Design a protein with these regions (language model features):
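N-terminal post-signal-peptidase region of extra-cytosolic proteins
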Residues: 29-43, 48-53
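Short N-terminal segments immediately surrounding and downstream of signal-peptide cleavage
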Residues: 9-30
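Short linear motifs in exposed loops
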Residues: 29, 36-37, 67, 76, ...
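Conserved short histidine dyad/triad with adjacent acidic residue
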Residues: 30-32, 73-78, 121-128, 132
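C-terminal interaction modules
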Residues: 1-11, 33-36, 50, 59, ...
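Short, small-residue-rich packing micro-motifs
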Residues: 47-57, 64-115, 119, 143-152
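Short, conserved beta-strand element in jelly-roll/cupin
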Residues: 20-22, 49, 121
Length: 212
């Protein structure tokens, strides 16, 4: 579906819906709405999970899964059958989220901003955790065959790193610092969704210490 500029400016245009919900969560728009299954998602929505969990599926079949105490704002979303004309821009302020790209596939037109990093995505499955201080932890996940699902460029004001191997990770403490050198984690998918940056994997802690 191609959304015209006029449609995009109209707040009532549906760009996706809540595909999973568990516990308490809200969608902030003109007012606060309780999150429920199949609830329409619109551009500029502010999704907050509180003590619950939510999954959002967009028109291109991309999915964002939010764990407890997460906050996500949908800045911009344009879907076109031609992936090169599509665009997604999100702000992820806190919590843990898993991002799975859909028909956007390998086009580098998906971007996510955290308080400390800018993340450019090319056809991938990854998680991002932002703690209460704004520190960001980004982990690239494998595809169903156990190989790299794509590529992520994590950037700050001082530089950038590329993640392109399964379970590679980087952290960013402040936007004025470089991201840490990528490390490969010894971790399973079962642990990913519940990961908190306040207790990062040992490999990440070691890499942070080496860069200080």
């Amino acid at each position: 579906m191609l959304l015209s500029q006029t449609q995009l400016l109209h707040s009532s245009v549906e760009i996706g819906s809540i595909s999973e919900v568990r516990g308490n969560a809200q969608v902030l728009r003109d007012k606060a709405y309780g999150a429920k299954l199949q609830f329409d998602i619109q551009q500029m929505d502010d999704v907050r999970t509180e003590s619950g969990r939510v999954a959002i599926t967009f028109q291109d079949e991309s999915t964002v899964k939010l764990t407890e105490h997460s906050k996500l704002v949908i800045d911009e979303y344009i879907y076109d059958p031609d992936p090169s004309k599509s665009k997604m821009a999100l702000k992820f302020a806190s919590g843990t989220a898993r991002f799975i790209t859909g028909k956007f596939n390998n086009k580098s037109n998906i971007s996510i901003r955290t308080p400390t990093a800018d993340i450019a995505i090319r056809g991938t499955d990854f998680t991002c955790t932002v703690d209460e201080l704004g520190r960001s932890l980004v982990i690239l996940l494998p595809d169903e065959n156990g190989i790299s699902s794509g590529e992520i460029l994590v950037s700050t004001a001082m530089g950038s790193v590329t993640l392109n191997k399964p379970y590679q990770a980087t952290t960013v403490s402040v936007y004025e610092n470089n991201p840490t050198k990528p490390v490969t984690l010894d971790i399973s998918l079962d642990l990913i969704d519940n990961m908190l940056i306040v207790n990062p994997p040992q490999e990440v802690e070691q890499q942070v210490e080496e860069t200080q």
